[in-house]
A protein has these predicted regions:
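Short Pro-Cys-Gly-centered "Cys-loop" motif that presents a nucleophilic cysteine in a tight turn
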Residues: 1-51, 65-309
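Short beta-strand->loop micro-motif that forms the acidic, two-metal-ion catalytic signature
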Residues: 58-66
């Protein structure tokens, strides 16, 4: 195995693939739990984050760490905490991400610009959005806007339950903790769809540790950075990834089809824990009603890719 090289004070691209190549980000709950864990650990361990982009079955980040040990401890700790919460929600055990994680040092401004474009353009390449900043989970839109995906939130005029939730969220953040699935489910059950999106933006803004100014410094301005992302998708030759030319929109399609079938949010989140027989039934159902390829449906349902059905 190639020995990992970490250069103190330099940007590094870190890539994580799920252990069985299965989907782990099914809903906004998964993204918010991951993000608040990630940001809490970055803040506690002094890691600078230039870019973060969780995708349905993998994640990209560009970070600056003081040492190899600091980077490894950071990645291992947030990965363990997220796996714990994700598994507890689904009554499962085990690792979520493959080990070891992939990383590559980026030395010089050109290399950093290239990998920032690559990381942030992943959702564009996977046909989820037309522009990197339109994907909520690149967090680019939060640089100069605290509510880019919801209506402005006026705390003093919010309903009583919303104010109570905001107070609880602030306390959680001040205590250095992260948001859990049970907290999100409780809040969402008492809020309207509009309020729920406001709360999601509020949580992201409160925990966000991305060093936008440092990322922007490689381009001169925020707008110049975005234009660079629009013009060049970037590249990565030092980390091995399994690429295909298919869109990730099929995972959202699978969710919509199952929702139309009558599956609740709780039932959807339990998909990875279903017995194989039930997964097989859903496998053929999704193949007949979406454009997803067999391997993509298997990844969505957490069926081994080499299993013949």
């Amino acid at each position: 195995m190639k020995k990992r090289k970490v250069y103190s004070g330099e940007a590094h691209h870190v890539f994580q693939r799920t252990r069985n190549k299965g989907v782990i980000f099914y809903s906004i709950h998964d993204y918010l739990v991951y993000f608040t864990i990630y940001c809490s650990q970055a803040r506690q361990r002094g890691v600078s984050v230039l870019s973060l982009c969780p995708m349905p079955d993998h994640t990209h980040q560009v970070i600056v760490a003081a040492s190899k040990n600091q980077m490894a401890t950071f990645v291992q700790t947030y990965s363990h905490l997220f796996a714990y919460e994700w598994n507890k929600k689904r009554k499962k055990k085990g690792f979520l991400f493959s080990h070891p994680f992939g990383s590559a040092a980026k030395l010089g401004n050109k290399q950093v610009r290239t990998v920032l474009a690559y990381s942030n353009n992943n959702p564009v390449e996977r046909k989820l959005v037309e522009r990197a900043e339109d994907y909520r989970w690149t967090f680019l839109a939060y640089y100069n806007n605290r509510n880019p995906f919801s209506l402005p939130l006026n705390e003093s005029h919010a309903k009583s339950y919303m104010r109570m939730a905001l107070k609880e969220i602030k306390q959680c953040r001040d205590d250095g903790q992260y948001i859990t699935y049970s907290m999100l489910e409780r809040w969402e059950s008492h809020l309207s769809a509009t309020e729920w999106q406001q709360l999601a933006d509020y949580i992201i803004g409160l925990w966000n540790v991305i060093d936008y100014e440092q990322a922007i410094s490689y381009y001169g301005s925020y707008d110049t950075m975005l234009r660079a992302f629009h013009d060049n998708t970037g590249s990565e030759y030092e980390i091995r990834e399994d690429h295909d030319n298919y869109t990730d929109t099929v995972y959202a399609d699978c969710t919509h089809v199952l929702q139309a079938k009558g599956l609740s949010a709780r039932q959807l989140s339990a998909i990875p824990s279903l017995p194989l027989e039930q997964k097989q039934q859903l496998y053929y159902y999704l193949l007949s009603r979406t454009s997803a390829r067999p391997a993509q449906v298997k990844k969505y349902l957490h069926i081994a890719l080499d299993l013949t059905l």
